[in-house]
Every structure is written in C-alpha cells, then in structure tokens.
C-alpha cells in the first residue's frame, strides 16, 4: 500500500505539534507494517524557528520526505497566515500530482487548506483520503475571538470544512468530545467520524527517578507542579496562577514550573512579576531528549484548556504525562477527553476552568496524600501501556488505512506486547547511571512529576 502523508511540519521538527505526532506515527507504521510505503510532503520550515530551512529532500525511517519551499505562516497577522496556508495547500497538490499514484492520502489540519488539496486530488485521481482533525477551524478561531462567529468569512470557512469532511473517506478525531462536536455541528454520521488518540512514546518517556537533572539544575525541592508545552491562547493559565497565589502562603513547599512558550508567555510572566507570585517559575522549552527528565521532575503535571475548547482539540501533552507515570490535574470540562480518561483510569483529578478553590484543594490533597498520587501515577503508566502507546495508535491507523484504500490488512511484524507495568502496584524507576529501583505505590516520596 502506497500512502502519502501531507503536513506543513514533519521530522526533524521535534518541538511538539502535529509534525512531531505524525513523525512518531510514521516511524511506528514503518516499524510494525513494513508493507506500507510512505511518502511525506511537508515544508522546509521548522515550527518554532523562523529562520531555519531544511533540505528539500531526505530519506528517514525508509520514508521519502519531500519538502516544499513555501512561506511559513508563523505567528503573524491572520491575513498573512491565510495566504501562507493557501500557498502550501496549492504547492502540496502540485507535488502530489508529480509523484505518481497513491492508494491513500493522509492529511492533518496544519494547515487547514490541506483538506482542499486532498479533496481536489481525490476528484482528479479517485484517491481516497483520511482527514485527521487535530485542531478544528474555523471553530477554534471563533472561540478564541480571532474570527466573528457570524461573519461571511466564518460561514464560508464552515461550509468548506463541512464539504471537506463529507468528501473524506474517514474523518479521524482525537477524542470522544471531538467526535460528538463534529457529528453535531457538521451533521456527519457517527460512523464517518472515528476516534484515534494521539498516543505517547512509552520507550522515550519512562517513569524516571525523581532525582532528575532538571530539578538539580533549577534547585527544585519540595512538591513540584509542572506544566510543559505550548502557552497558547486556548489554555487556562489564569486559574493556575490564581491557585499558585493561594498556595503561596498556605503550602510553601509547592512550586509551580511552567515550561514552554507561545502567545500567553508575556501575560504569564507579567502576572508573575507584577503580582510577585514567587512560587512560579517560567522556563523555555527543553530539548526533546530532556523531555522525559522534565516530566519526571514534577509531583503533578497540569493540563489546561479554556472554556469551550473541548471538542475542538485534545492536548497531546496528556499522553506524555501518562507515559511518565505521574498523576494529572486538569482544568477542563467534565465531558472533555482528558476528563473522561482521568475518571476511567483513576489517574488524576479534574475541575472546571476557573475553579481556583478546586485546583488548590486538588494539589493540597495530593501533596498530603502521596500514596494516592503514587497510585494515580501507577494507573497512568498502566493505561498508557495498555491503550495509548504509539504502537497501539499505529495499529488503529493501519486498520483504518487498509479499509479506506481497499487493501488487505496484514498482522503487525511483532505483536503488541502486554503492559510491562507489574500487577502488584510497583513501578520500576530508571535512574541514569544506576540500576532500576522498585518503588512501592504506597511509598511516601514517589512519583514526582
């Protein structure tokens, strides 16, 4: 089966987002299903580096990568982003037509114009396409106040979005909340919209010892609450900062570490400085190879979303937190995918956005009940290994791809191994330079994230 994946960003971009997610999916597919021949059409740009340019062609993981020399949408004006997105979509369509016939095209939503390219390519060649909705626009732009809800451009974009979804052979979304939203708002039959989670890398991200290099480098002691990832406008940071202010006087051992960058970084830094929230530390992104060490540095990891964003996206960082074997505290609505997994797997606590008292209470509870935090962390890793590894996700994609392309599905090269988390509630922490250590789930100083 010949498959072409089209996305603006791809390997070696390792700064998160759809490029990194699709790179990991491609590697997992090529490893377990070598009969799948994959080409990738992407850009020469890196997501967080405006100046860097990659080579126009590369081979990686037995995959051909074709990079288009198109302008980067970046973080400029809405008009500039729309024009850059349109140029990439048109260039991708031209490239598709020069590469020969494929059995299937797989596209994401970076940029949203890719669906137009895939739809046109299907019309010209009868090639089916899978439409993976990572972030749903224009709905997300409307919720963030970028586009007026009833403007002519919004209505036009919604009509296009509905057409692209209808023409796709399958729409793939990241969670049940997204499936419910898409079927309701765009009138699609439930069987046309399939849920496949993002998944996490259970090999690169492990339940490491709490004695991390990150903690040592930043002199972090006590109970560490960590947020790592994009400081985007659709994340609820004010609730986190308000909770930090409340805990400043009552729980002096609690430290908040916010690692990343994005649209809200200046706002966060301004509040921390002006309001003297001294228990909050704001740090830049860490390299990918240090990410597992970062996640192991916290006793609790945070997931946030602004109200109304459920159904439009699912934070990918959540699955990395599961892989780290740490509990999650999430300020999200109860019907979001994150909240559902937390409840189903008993691997964290959820409160609605703006619930400062609830967030303070949740963090204080886990601070004073480390055995419960340890149990939740154990459950998190167990859930990841049983349901949400990259290999599990690749298997779901492979079956869907074969159905859409009308190809015979072959077994994976290696069967999916059962969970390596032992059934006795013991996680094995890997410590750099030392032998692995068994830590009972009931111990009092375990599972710091």
Per-region residue spans from a language model:
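Acidic anion/phosphate-binding donor-loop and adjacent secondary structure
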Residues: 53, 183-184, 190-192, 199-216, ...
């Amino acid at each position: 089966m010949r498959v072409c994946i089209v996305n603006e960003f791809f390997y070696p971009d390792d700064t998160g987002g759809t490029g990194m997610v699709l790179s990991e999916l491609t590697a997992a597919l090529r490893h377990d299903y070598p009969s799948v021949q994959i080409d990738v059409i992407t850009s020469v740009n890196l997501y967080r580096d405006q100046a860097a340019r990659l080579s126009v062609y590369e081979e990686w993981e037995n995959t051909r990568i074709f990079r288009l020399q198109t302008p980067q949408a970046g973080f400029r004006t809405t008009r500039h982003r729309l024009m850059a997105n349109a140029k990439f979509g048109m260039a991708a369509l031209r490239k598709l037509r020069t590469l020969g016939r494929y059995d299937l095209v797989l596209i994401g939503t970076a940029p949203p114009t890719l669906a137009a390219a895939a739809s046109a390519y299907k019309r010209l060649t009868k090639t089916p396409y899978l439409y993976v909705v990572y972030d749903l626009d224009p709905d997300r732009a409307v919720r963030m106040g970028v586009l007026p809800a009833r403007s002519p451009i919004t209505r036009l974009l919604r009509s296009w979005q509905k057409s692209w979804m209808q023409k796709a052979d399958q729409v793939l979304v990241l969670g049940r909340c997204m499936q419910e939203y898409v079927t309701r708002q765009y009138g699609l039959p439930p069987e046309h919209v399939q849920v496949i989670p993002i998944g996490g890398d259970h090999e690169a991200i492990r339940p490491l010892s709490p004695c991390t290099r990150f903690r040592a480098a930043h002199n972090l002691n006590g109970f560490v609450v960590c947020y790592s990832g994009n400081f985007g406008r659709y994340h609820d940071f004010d609730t986190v900062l308000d909770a930090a202010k409340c805990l400043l006087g009552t729980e002096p051992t609690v430290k908040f570490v916010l690692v990343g960058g994005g649209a809200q970084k200046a706002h966060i830094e301004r509040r921390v400085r002006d309001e003297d929230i001294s228990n909050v530390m704001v740090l830049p992104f860490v390299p990918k190879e240090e990410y597992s060490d970062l996640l192991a540095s916290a006793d609790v990891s945070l997931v946030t979303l602004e109200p109304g964003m459920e159904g439009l996206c699912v934070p990918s960082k959540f699955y990395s937190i599961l892989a780290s074997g740490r509990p999650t505290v999430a300020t999200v609505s109860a019907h979001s995918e994150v909240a559902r997994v937390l409840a189903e797997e008993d691997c964290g606590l959820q409160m609605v956005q703006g619930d400062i008292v609830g967030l303070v209470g949740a963090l204080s509870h886990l601070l004073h009940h480390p055995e419960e935090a340890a149990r939740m962390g154990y459950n998190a890793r167990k859930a990841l290994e049983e349901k949400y590894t990259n290999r599990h996700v690749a298997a779901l994609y492979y079956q869907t791809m074969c159905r859409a392309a009308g190809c015979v599905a072959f077994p994976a090269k290696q069967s999916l191994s059962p969970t390596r988390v032992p059934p006795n509630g013991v996680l094995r922490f890997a410590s750099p330079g030392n032998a692995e250590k068994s830590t009972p789930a009931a111990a009092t100083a375990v599972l710091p994230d």
